[in-house]
């Protein structure tokens, strides 16, 4: 029942929200937001287990699939679409599904989140298999669409995890790993796009970033698999080569072009003074880890 969920409780500190000045509203929001990172901190060990599972999927050429409804679904898609430009993944490696389909990203699709079978259909459409990891996201922890997706994922042998913002969440029963970030009452009762949404975004940031580090997408703290899809990213790529090698901007640019815009290869070429082909071989042998290739 909704009344039993902490995310649905009224916040005692904001009972007079409609009487507050604009500044008081903003201060209240800021004060509540400060509690979110601390709530996430309590779930670090569980998040670590999720990351380890995702890395295993990636190593077996499996995928990371997010499923959610409303804000939760949008956050999953947001995290997924940032992976190709940031980490050089293809658009299948990390995917996000929202109840009601992509049109629900910009406009609510009434009733979609209440249908378990829609998630099964979505996951069947991509040929979900035992190598994949499915993460169900629901602030309330009770969304039928997410439960349906997790049930189907388990039936095909995929790894499963859940992210919710209530303890003992219903979706936790259908996932092997559970991240339950208890964010408590919102300043605006039941508006889980606020603290709960912030917590979900923090957890998703952790999962995707740490997992990509785990499969060699990062060298030191540089995103060396960045895709140069626009002018800003071309410049960033060159600067990454400068930072990683200590070379001048001109030398970095030269090797960036020699390496056919492959930042990892350019770094290896500069530091080992080798040709492009040799750099690629070293990276292949090192399974994409620049440090091992060196």
Curated annotation (Swiss-Prot):
It comes from Bacillus cereus (strain B4264). This is N-acetylmuramic acid 6-phosphate etherase. SUPFAM superfamilies: SIS domain. Signal peptide: none annotated. It catalyses: N-acetyl-D-muramate 6-phosphate + H2O = N-acetyl-D-glucosamine 6-phosphate + (R)-lactate. Residues 54-217 form the SIS domain. The active site is at 82 (proton donor), 113. One of its GO terms (molecular function) is carbohydrate derivative binding. Specifically catalyzes the cleavage of the D-lactyl ether substituent of MurNAc 6-phosphate, producing GlcNAc 6-phosphate and D-lactate. Pathway: Amino-sugar metabolism; N-acetylmuramate degradation. Keywords: Carbohydrate metabolism, Lyase. GO terms for biological process: amino sugar catabolic process; N-acetylmuramic acid catabolic process; peptidoglycan turnover. A lyase-type mechanism (elimination/hydration) is suggested for the cleavage of the lactyl ether bond of MurNAc 6-phosphate, with the formation of an alpha,beta-unsaturated aldehyde intermediate with (E)-stereochemistry, followed by the syn addition of water to give product. It comes from the Bacteria. Belongs to the GCKR-like family. MurNAc-6-P etherase subfamily. Homodimer. PANTHER family: GLUCOKINASE REGULATORY PROTEIN. InterPro entries: Etherase_MurQ, Glucokinase_regulatory_CS, MURQ/GCKR, SIS_dom, SIS_dom_sf. Its EC number is 4.2.1.126.
């Amino acid at each position: 029942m909704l009344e039993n969920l902490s995310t649905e409780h009224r916040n005692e500190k904001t009972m007079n929200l409609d009487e507050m000045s604009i500044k008081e509203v903003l201060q209240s929001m800021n004060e509540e937001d400060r509690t979110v990172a601390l709530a996430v901190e309590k779930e670090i060990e569980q998040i670590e287990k999720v990351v380890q599972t995702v890395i295993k999927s990636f190593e077996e050429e499996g995928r990371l699939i997010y499923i959610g409804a409303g804000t939760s679904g949008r956050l999953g898609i947001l995290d997924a679409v940032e992976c190709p430009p940031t980490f050089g993944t293809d658009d299948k490696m990390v995917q996000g599904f929202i109840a009601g389909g992509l049109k629900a990203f910009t406009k609510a699709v009434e009733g979609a989140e209440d249908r378990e079978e829609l998630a099964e259909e979505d996951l069947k459409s991509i040929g979900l298999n035992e190598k994949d990891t499915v993460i169900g996201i629901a602030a309330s922890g009770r969304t039928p669409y997410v439960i349906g997706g997790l049930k189907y994922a388990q039936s095909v042998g995929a790894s499963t995890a859940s992210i919710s913002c209530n303890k003992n969440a219903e979706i936790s029963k259908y996932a092997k790993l559970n991240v339950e970030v208890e964010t408590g009452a919102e300043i605006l009762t039941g508006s889980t796009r606020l603290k709960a949404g912030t917590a979900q975004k923090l957890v998703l940031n952790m999962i995707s970033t740490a997992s990509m580090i785990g499969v060699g997408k990062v060298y030191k703290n540089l995103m060396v698999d960045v895709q140069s899809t626009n002018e800003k990213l071309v410049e960033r790529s060159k600067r990454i080569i400068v930072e990683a090698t200590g070379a001048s901007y001109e030398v970095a640019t030269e090797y960036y072009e020699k390496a056919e815009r492959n930042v990892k290869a350019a770094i290896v070429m500069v530091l080992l003074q080798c040709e492009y082909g040799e750099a690629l071989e070293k990276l292949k042998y090192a399974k994409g880890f620049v440090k091992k290739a060196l």
